[in-house]
């Protein structure tokens, strides 16, 4: 089976089952969400993907949260992207940086919708 087919199958398995997941259960090495946030901001990932992976305001970067995909797919996309995203070699983003960013994205919480914010209910 090709690498992309295996990644797609793994992603569908993860997306289909709403089991309590951890970053490690999706194949990520140990990492620090705090350090991952720093790397994510320093590498300017937020300019396309939003501050917590919710997608870019201009639609330039796809949403990468709240549906986490396997770590292998994340790492492959960062290293050898298939879209307009620039590649990040291990000279720019270390393997540990990748793990840390994954832990950061996995730890983020979705923003509330406007109707659930009391001050915005009347607008």
What is each model feature region?
Residues 19-41, 55:
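Electrostatic cytochrome c docking/interface patches
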Residues 1-4:
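Positively charged n-region of N-terminal signal peptides that target proteins for export
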Residues 26, 54-58, 68, 115-123:
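Mature soluble domains of exported/periplasmic/lumenal proteins and thiol-rich metal-chelating peptides
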Residues 36, 42-51, 85, 101, ...:
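The canonical Cys-X-X-Cys-His
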Residues 6-15:
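Bacterial N-terminal signal peptides
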Residues 90-123:
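C-terminal capping alpha-helices of c-type cytochrome domains
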Residues 33-37, 50-87:
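Gly/Gly-Pro-rich "capping" loops immediately C-terminal to redox-active cysteine motifs
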């Amino acid at each position: 089976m090709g690498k992309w087919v295996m990644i797609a199958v793994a992603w569908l398995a993860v997306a289909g089952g709403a089991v309590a997941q951890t970053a490690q259960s999706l194949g990520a090495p140990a990492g620090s969400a705090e350090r991952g946030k720093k790397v994510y901001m320093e590498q300017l990932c937020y300019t396309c993907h939003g501050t917590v992976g919710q997608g870019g305001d201009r639609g330039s970067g796809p949403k990468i949260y709240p549906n986490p995909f396997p770590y292998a797919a994340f790492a492959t996309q960062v290293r050898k992207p298939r879209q307009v995203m620039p590649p990040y070699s291990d000279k720019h983003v270390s393997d540990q940086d990748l793990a840390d960013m994954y832990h950061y994205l996995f730890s983020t919480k979705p923003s509330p919708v406007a109707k659930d914010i009391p001050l915005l209910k009347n607008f």
